[in-house]
Design a protein with these regions (language model features):
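Hydrophobic/small/kink-forming positions within alpha-helical transmembrane segments
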Residues: 33-41, 68, 91-99, 121-126, ...
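Specific transmembrane alpha-helical segments of multi-pass solute transporters/efflux pumps
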Residues: 35-38, 75-112, 153, 233-248
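Transmembrane alpha-helical segments that form core, pore/gating elements
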Residues: 37, 41-44, 52, 67, ...
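C-terminal transmembrane-helix exit sites in multi-pass transporters
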Residues: 103, 120-142, 263-282
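Hydrophobic transmembrane alpha-helices of multi-pass small-molecule transport proteins
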Residues: 139-155, 172, 280-299
Length: 310
């Protein structure tokens, strides 16, 4: 067997093959973006008929029916109550983020909500650095700065007063980022299915308590029932399908597919709710996406090179 040839300068090293495109992964991602769009539209429809917190309660009730099917299989893991304080903290943050996001969906153009939601990778990086000690690369710092510019383009502070609901959506993206960091820590001791079951079991009483305090229960109309089913089922399917996509396909391919949510929801908002298609919102969304995608792609490439040479 010939002796291995020493690696030459970095520029002479053979290029790594591009990540493979998986047909199954693409289909899973299309299911995910369809679920997120369905959840937003159903939330908008229900927000005209009932309080936001009631939407979250009904969403959790649908989730509880699904969790009941999983509970017998997961009971041995559930009864150990491992890391319960972390589950509780994660769901307090996630519940608040869901409330802010749903309120944003009710009050803002849907495309603006989705554009601002794409700032979540910024918050994940910052919270992972603060809570888990993960290193923030220079390109990630640059992505955070450019993403902030994209946020300013979306919000257009010079064009008048910023809608407070837009700040709520930014806060929800931060909350989802913090929740993702909690999930990253929880996966050391709990399966994804158990994390989802705990989410339903904890967030349902949170919603019921808040609903009792506000006294805002409104009896659903028959026309609301399909939207209740959609908002509950898509809340589960959106995250499940994305997890399945990322299991079989590189994130650098999956995330651009997910970004199609922004132009698609802009068209739906225009057709269904007469929302104008804003060039500033779309351009700002592209800036936010491009910054985070470039950083993610560079970091993934660095990891692949490290594995290839290690």
């Amino acid at each position: 067997m010939p002796a291995p040839v020493p690696a030459g300068p970095a520029q002479d090293a053979p290029a790594l093959p591009p990540p493979a495109i998986s047909t199954a992964g693409v289909l899973w991602m299309l299911g995910s973006l369809t679920s997120f769009i369905g959840m937003a539209v159903a939330s908008r429809q229900l927000s005209t008929a009932m309080p936001i917190v009631q939407i979250l309660v009904l969403r959790s009730l649908v989730g509880l029916a699904v969790a009941a099917l999983l509970a017998p299989r997961l009971w041995p893991e559930l009864r150990r109550h491992r890391d319960f304080p972390l589950h509780l903290a994660r769901n307090v943050v996630h519940f608040a983020a869901q409330y802010a996001w749903t309120l944003g969906v009710a009050l803002l153009p849907l495309a603006q909500v989705f554009a601002l939601e794409f700032t979540m990778p910024i918050w994940v990086a910052l919270f992972a650095w603060a809570a888990l000690g993960e290193r923030v690369t220079r390109i990630r710092i640059a992505a955070i700065a450019v993403s902030f510019l994209g946020v300013l383009i979306v919000l257009r502070p010079g064009a008048g007063m910023i809608n407070p609901a837009a700040l709520l959506v930014l806060a929800s993206a931060a909350g989802y980022g913090a929740s993702a960091v909690f999930v990253k820590r929880l996966t050391r001791s709990a399966s994804p299915a158990v994390i989802v079951v705990w989410m339903v079991l904890l967030q349902l009483p949170m919603g019921l308590a808040l609903l009792a305090l506000t006294g805002g229960w409104v009896a659903p109309r028959p026309a609301d029932l399909p939207w209740i089913a959609v908002v509950g089922l898509t809340a589960l399917s959106a995250h499940y399908t994305m997890a399945q996509a990322l299991r079989v396909m590189d994130a650098s391919i999956a995330i651009p597919i997910d970004f199609l949510r922004v132009p698609l929801i802009a068209v739906i908002g225009w057709l269904a709710y007469a929302e104008p298609i804003s060039a500033a919102v779309l351009f700002g969304a592209v800036v936010i996406f491009a910054a985070n995608f470039t950083a993610m792609r560079a970091e993934a490439l660095a990891r692949r090179r490290a594995r290839a040479t290690g």
